[in-house]
């Protein structure tokens, strides 16, 4: 299994039997460029939270390309998804999509969204973990240690004169580089910070 990051913070998982898009956030054109490879549309899109930087234009993309959207009930309730084929999961939950050849597991994470989670995707050969947002601790990270690859998008470095209230809020829902380095110091797989 391979992956590609993109300019708007999403990830495309490239599986043997098809691709999975993780999160929107870009313009429709940006999402099409990032998620449609050689004319092949993704077999599904996973949206990890309702925040604009993750959910922007997912409805338009999924409707235009007839791509099912996988998310949680609480996240879906926050989005305008009329007409979109939505597959609802709860946190924590694991679901095997036999026909498409992949399984997904959702694990709760500390973040300021309706039902935050990180996910692992297994294609029967490899397992990849993605933490788009949220603060993780060693007790949660253990669920990622069985993954061949882990992609961390929950890294934060506060620069300059951020107001103290903003800095505290961000530090409560994101990890620093140092925290993540410590948490994953004994991880044997491939680790990517995006």
Sequence positions of predicted segments:
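Catalytic core of the metallo-beta-lactamase
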Residues: 95-149
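Glycine/small-residue-rich loop that forms an oxyanion/phosphate-binding "nest" at active or ligand-binding sites
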Residues: 51, 55-113
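Conserved beta-strand hairpin/beta-sheet module of binuclear metal-dependent hydrolase folds
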Residues: 1-37, 117-133, 149
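Cap/insert and terminal regions of metallo-dependent hydrolase folds
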Residues: 139-194
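Active-site metal-binding motif and surrounding structural segment of the metallo-beta-lactamase
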Residues: 27-71, 146-148
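Short, acidic/turn-prone active-site loops that include or flank metal/cofactor-
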Residues: 26-27, 74-76, 91-96, 134-136, ...
